[in-house]
Amino acid sequence: VSGSPPTPPSARRHILVAEDDPDIARMLERVLSAEYRVTVASNGFEAVAIAAKKPPNLLMLDIMMPGVDGLTAARQIRELPGLKNVPIIFLTAKDGPLDVIKGIQSGARHYITKPFKLDDVVAKVKKILKT
């Protein structure tokens, strides 16, 4: 609706991005924060801790991260109260067929390999969050 006031940040859908490459994390945060609340974690352990305090509407996880990897973080986050069905997008350099199968079997809606087109990622986010 044209002319309607902007949605206050606190009412926006929350995306938790777990990415250990600071350049990619900043780029995703910059682009997605125009429409969503974005929280960035630099590893899987941090992502699980953030999700427990601020439950996300969408997880965007790198698979290869130090400490707790994205697959493990996704499993742990989905064990948290109310997050069993939180949608997941994996963003990763792991592009082998078995890697993709593991990602999809872990419940991911999308498995996007790096390098990726930012427009494609944004389109997938919008489709999942219906905005």
Model regions and ranges:
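Charged docking surfaces used in two-component/phosphorelay signaling
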Residues: 23-33
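C-terminal output helix
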Residues: 116-126
